[in-house]
């Protein structure tokens, strides 16, 4: 095999397939068959003994009555996630509990620790005020 052929194959197939597979490549548990793990051990007389705990077990949920198909079209538009803001986090977590207590008449403005409010930041690793970074 010529030099140009080897370079061309390396560019087309990818360089990782062109280099020689030696014991120096990959971890000790990685076998030559591209990621397959061993499912047993070899005994002293070179016989392979399969160990049940080493055989991978695939857990598949029951999908009877499931309406969605397992295929997603590659032309489907990408999903849009709005960034999480402090206001949105407050509206999702604390606001329902405050509204419920306000309607029941049990809301106490002096007892905000009930909703997760911390009046001081002493003893915290990362403090919001003063800033953790030097100016």
UniProtKB/Swiss-Prot annotation:
Role played: Component of the mitochondrial ribosome large subunit. Also involved in apoptosis and cell cycle. Enhances p53/TP53 stability, thereby contributing to p53/TP53-induced apoptosis in response to growth-inhibitory condition. Enhances p53/TP53 translocation to the mitochondria. Has the ability to arrest the cell cycle at the G1 phase, possibly by stabilizing the CDKN1A and CDKN1B (p27Kip1) proteins.
Keyword check for Cell cycle: yes
Family from the record: Belongs to the mitochondrion-specific ribosomal protein mL41 family.
GO terms under cellular component: mitochondrial inner membrane; mitochondrial large ribosomal subunit; mitochondrion; ribonucleoprotein complex
PANTHER family noted in UniProt: LARGE RIBOSOMAL SUBUNIT PROTEIN ML41, MITOCHONDRIAL RIBOSOMAL PROTEIN L41
UniProt cross-references to InterPro entries, sorted A to Z: Ribosomal_mL41
Signal peptide range in chain numbering: none
Subcellular location: Mitochondrion
Molecular function in Gene Ontology: structural constituent of ribosome
Residues annotated as transit peptide in the record: 1-13
GO biological process, alphabetically ordered: apoptotic process; mitochondrial translation; translation
Protein name: Large ribosomal subunit protein mL41
Subunit structure: Component of the mitochondrial ribosome large subunit (39S) which comprises a 16S rRNA and about 50 distinct proteins. Interacts with BCL2.
Keywords, ordered alphabetically: Apoptosis, Cell cycle, Mitochondrion, Ribonucleoprotein, Ribosomal protein, Transit peptide
Disulfide bonds: none
Taxonomic source organism: Mus musculus (Mouse)
Main subcellular location: mitochondrion
């Amino acid at each position: 095999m010529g030099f140009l052929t080897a370079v061309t194959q390396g560019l087309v197939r990818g360089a990782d397939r062109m280099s020689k597979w030696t014991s120096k490549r990959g971890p000790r548990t990685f076998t030559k068959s591209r990621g397959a793990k061993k499912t047993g051990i070899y005994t002293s007389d070179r016989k392979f003994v399969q160990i049940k705990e080493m055989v991978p077990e695939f857990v598949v949920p029951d999908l009877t009555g499931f309406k969605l198909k397992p295929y997603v079209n590659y032309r489907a538009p990408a999903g849009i996630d709005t960034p999480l803001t402090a206001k949105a986090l407050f509206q999702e977590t604390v606001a329902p509990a405050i509204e419920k207590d306000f309607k029941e008449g049990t809301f106490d403005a002096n007892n905000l620790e009930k909703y997760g409010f911390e009046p001081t930041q002493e003893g915290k690793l990362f403090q919001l005020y003063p800033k953790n970074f030097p100016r």
